[in-house]
């Protein structure tokens, strides 16, 4: 029999917080590090309990991500092949025409996606660029798809414009812990990112915010990223967890491979600390075998990016995704769009589509 919904917050979460952390933080960094230190099976067991209390454990949302403006970005994010500062073979392109974007969105819906994300390699959008993106949002929304964009930094009035267009989610990742951030990016500050997230939240748009693991961060710094996310008020509605995709020409191309179990642990800790968030298995999935992806679902991931490209890096082919989900007995979830202002009603109306692998 289902007991009262579980929101796993150990007593350790009440421990003294780290310097610079708000004294009323829901999760101290020490408590999060304690989760990372749990035996693997214990951590996954707790994460699965939290997941089942808040979601259908056998359902996954399919998202498609389209790069609507590729390359030529002036930023110096050390992991990114779209930076104009690195020779990665990614050529700068113009913003895609609206008709081409809507055609891609239509294909995504036909292939089973319920969420369509649009990414542009900008530091921050100019007024005419934002006007075009707002029109794209309106067109995608008219198809019945959930919408998300990631365009760089936003001003308050720009966030309001996207809200007026009907945008559901704005993605702006923190990437890593504050103290490690300067090792990865120098062209925008951590506070710049927090300011954009505040503008998005104030406009009434759902926040999509996560990070990247495998950048060379320590477990302490990985816990710091989760602490920043989990202690947002409210914590993000959508939390993409990315595994570094090493691209030749970027400063991080020679990084050591992350232990796969450490990636699964990060998914599990995100699920425990942000129980009602959509935890999205994001970049790096192309290099994961089926067993590792299954462990990520067990740990609480309930969304994948679906399609052949994730911005400029490979992503598992759609047919392989369908076959994997079918082998696991998982279903595609098509959720009514929700704005969890206080993360209430995470189990609102939804339907499921059984997955049949293509021949």
Swiss-Prot record:
Q: Where does [2Fe-2S] cluster bind?
A: 117, 148, 208, 280
Which note does the record give on the cofactor?
A: Binds 1 [4Fe-4S] cluster. The cluster is coordinated with 3 cysteines and an exchangeable S-adenosyl-L-methionine.
Its annotated pathway reads: Cofactor biosynthesis; biotin biosynthesis; biotin from 7,8-diaminononanoate: step 2/2
| SUPFAM superfamilies noted in UniProt | Radical SAM enzymes
Q: Which residues form a coiled coil?
A: none
The reaction(s) catalysed by this protein are: (4R,5S)-dethiobiotin + (sulfur carrier)-SH + 2 reduced [2Fe-2S]-[ferredoxin] + 2 S-adenosyl-L-methionine = (sulfur carrier)-H + biotin + 2 5'-deoxyadenosine + 2 L-methionine + 2 oxidized [2Fe-2S]-[ferredoxin]
Binding site residues for [4Fe-4S] cluster:
73, 77, 80
Instruction: Give residue ranges for domain Radical SAM core.
Output: 58-285
* Cofactors required: [4Fe-4S] cluster; [2Fe-2S] cluster
Chain positions covered by the region annotation Disordered:
1-22
Q: Which GO terms describe its biological process?
A: biotin biosynthetic process
Which Enzyme Commission number(s) are listed? Answer: 2.8.1.6
Q: What class of enzyme is it?
A: transferase
Role noted for this protein: Catalyzes the conversion of dethiobiotin (DTB) to biotin by the insertion of a sulfur atom into dethiobiotin via a radical-based mechanism.
Please state which protein family the record places this protein in: Belongs to the radical SAM superfamily. Biotin synthase family.
Q: Subunit comment for this entry? A: Homodimer.
* The protein's name in its UniProt record: Biotin synthase
List the source organism.
Ralstonia pickettii (strain 12J)
């Amino acid at each position: 029999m289902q007991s009262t919904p579980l929101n796993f917050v150990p007593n350790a979460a009440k421990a003294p917080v780290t310097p610079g952390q708000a004294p009323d933080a829901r999760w101290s960094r020490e408590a999060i590090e304690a989760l990372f230190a749990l035996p693997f099976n214990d951590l996954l067991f707790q994460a699965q309990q939290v997941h089942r209390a808040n979601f259908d454990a056998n359902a996954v949302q399919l998202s498609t991500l389209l790069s609507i403006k590729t390359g030529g970005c002036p930023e110096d994010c050390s992991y990114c092949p779209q930076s104009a500062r690195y020779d990665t073979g990614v050529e700068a392109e113009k913003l895609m025409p609206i008709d081409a974007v809507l055609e891609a969105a239509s294909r995504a819906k036909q292939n089973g996606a319920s969420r369509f994300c649009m990414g542009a390699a900008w530091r921050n959008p100019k007024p005419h660029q934002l006007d075009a993106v707002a029109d794209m949002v309106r067109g995608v929304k008219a198809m019945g798809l959930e919408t998300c964009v990631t365009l760089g930094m936003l001003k308050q009035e720009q966030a309001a414009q996207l809200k007026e267009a009907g945008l559901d989610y704005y993605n702006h990742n923190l990437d890593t812990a504050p103290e490690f951030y300067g090792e990865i990016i120098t062209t925008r500050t951590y506070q710049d990112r927090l300011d954009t997230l505040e503008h998005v939240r104030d406009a009434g748009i759902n926040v999509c915010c996560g990070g990247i693991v495998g950048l060379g961060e320590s477990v302490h710094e990985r816990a710091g990223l989760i602490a920043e996310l989990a202690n947002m008020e409210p914590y993000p509605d959508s939390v993409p967890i990315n595994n570094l995709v090493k691209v030749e020409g970027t400063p991080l191309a020679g990084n050591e491979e992350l232990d796969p179990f450490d990636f699964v642990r990060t998914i599990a800790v995100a699920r425990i600390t942000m129980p009602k968030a959509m935890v999205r298995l994001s970049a790096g999935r192309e290099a994961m075998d089926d067993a590792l992806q299954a462990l990520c679902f067990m740990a609480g991931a309930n969304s994948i990016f679906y399609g052949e490209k994730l911005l400029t890096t490979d992503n598992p082919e759609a047919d392989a995704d369908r076959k994997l989900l079918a082998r696991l007995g998982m279903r595609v979830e098509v959720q009514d769009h929700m704005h969890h202002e206080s993360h209430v009603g995470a189990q609102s109306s939804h339907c499921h589509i059984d997955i049949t692998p293509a021949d």
